[in-house]
Amino acid sequence: MKFKRNDTITQGEKTYTVTDFLGEGGQGEVYLVECEGSEYALKIYKDHVSADFRYNLKNNIAKGAPSSEFLWPIELLDFDDGDLGYIMDLRPKNYVSFVSYLTGKNKFADKSVMLKWCISLCTAFKKLHEEGYSYQDLNDGSFFFDPDTGALLICDNDNVTADKKNLGVLGKMRYMAPEIVRGDKTRSGSVQLPDVHSDRFSLAVILFMALCLGNPFEGERLKNYDIVDEEAEYEMFGKDPVFVYHKTDKSNRPIRGYHSAVLRRWAYVPIYIKEAFHRTFVDGLRDRENERTTPLEWIKLLSRYRDELITCGACGYDYIVGYAEKKRYTECPSCNTPTKDFCTLHIGRSDIALDLGKRVYEPHVDKFSSKYGSVVGRVVSNKNNPSLW
């Protein structure tokens, strides 16, 4: 470790005191530091970084975070020995890693909260791309959530660069766009590097994993390999990726007894969400620039999904009423209790299944609003007669 507890670091007029070692990754070490009564995280790079990397980091700090969801670098630290580090805000303790959700250690309070997190994720990347950036390395370790509220935080933002520019980071296997895995050539003859279009692919992978708890390209073809090594991963995620719910190529369906969560959850995903995944993971392999679902498209689709949710009064399971399905659900998918009566609120093009606690958001009443997390109304029970809403 470069620092030990109570070491001090002076930068200009500020002095940071190291209070704890938080951990390390491939790039560097992270410390808990204190300055003027506030706590921050300090990341120190293990190796000397390039001048381009330093310039990019400095420029990102000057421009500031695209939104509050990004744990963005806020101050650059240069050391006499040539090492580089930066200060960022500390992740609050009520936030847990997305990885812990995938492994079952932590859960969202309910499906509506999970969808709020997904919408926030898409909104954050919409803003990032609008600022002219691409994230370039979306993976399961990049995100955190508050299990109770669905609030989002995004870490590892030091690799974010201007779109079409790359500083050496390609991404993490299982999340990278296939053309990045393969090292395809662009029209100009250069190697295809991460950009906004590869971000869109990786974002769809994260959303699929959030909704279905599995990877969209891991299915029956896993049986072709004695061990999933680099060669196997290259074939599954680069050379010849096949979406597990490809409409015509059924060679890679989820394995019963192994991908149980995917099989169970996919069955109750709304058809318009399924179509968006198919477009990205099938058509988007052929046409990366036009057929990958954009963050804004995801926001609208996921908001529609949230509008359709109702809660089973018997077991508390959240499921959709099925406005867009050929056959509406007449019983709870979890406990088979018959679907209770509910009212539908029609606002413009939105159909909102009313349930106790259901929220109405600003875009419902203002078609020009992009505040998909801003609540303007909520279904509550009558104080004098709780059976009335």
Give the ranges of each region predicted by the language model.
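Conserved structural core of kinase catalytic domains
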Residues: 71-117
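Conserved C-lobe activation region of Hanks-type protein kinase-like domains
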Residues: 207-274
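Forkhead-associated
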Residues: 356-389
